Amino acid sequence: AVVTYARHLQNLDEGSGLPTAITRALQEQDIQFVNTGMDDGWDSCYPGRKFTPIYNENLAYYDSTVAVGTQSYHPVIYELPVDTDGDGGLFESFRGTLRNIRLCGAQISAGGNAGGLAGSLRGGTTIEGCQVYLSPTRDKLSSKSEQDIWISGATAGGLVGRCGYDLTVRNSFASSVLEGGRYAGGLVGYISGTRTVYVEHSYADCYLYASGTTGGLIGSCIGTADITLRDCYTAGFQEADV
């Protein structure tokens, strides 16, 4: 599937009736959810409507890369609006490969797990070259403070809320303000079970708030996961009750 508009993105959800033969998606243009001024934009087609996080058992690959001659460009998703009682993010849950996604100014509120890319994982996943961040100009950060939450849920992570499966993260970062009811992590909110988690050449620069625990890269790990962090760093601010 080729993704060029917000409605194309929404149609990746199983609820749209997307053919089961479609297992891959390629984003080829910037996607803007607010103030587009376009007749076929999200605001015009669905005024006041929030984005429903994508759930699709068959979709296992998403890439945001466009080749321009010998160079490549990575289209951006701007101001993704999510407000859900379940898990929330660009994807409700995901398994497979996410590559080169650019998520700018995402506002995600979830009753369950919340993550910029995925609220939770439902299978082994690789995240490569992805970015979740805020823009000082587009997101009007001069009028906001570190108390303005952009990603919130029972568990919150800059990239992934809850990880219960093997996960590899490479060359990715998150820079936002997160609040977790129990856990909040710059990249991953919570890891559970006996899993292998490998994070390389990645970082988080976030404000993190939680009633339980926070972590610059990983909010909490319960179980006997094998975690490797290589050439990573974290910055920002953390506030937790535990």
Specify the residue positions occupied by each region the protein language model found.
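Surface-exposed repetitive/solenoidal architectures
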Residues: 1-242
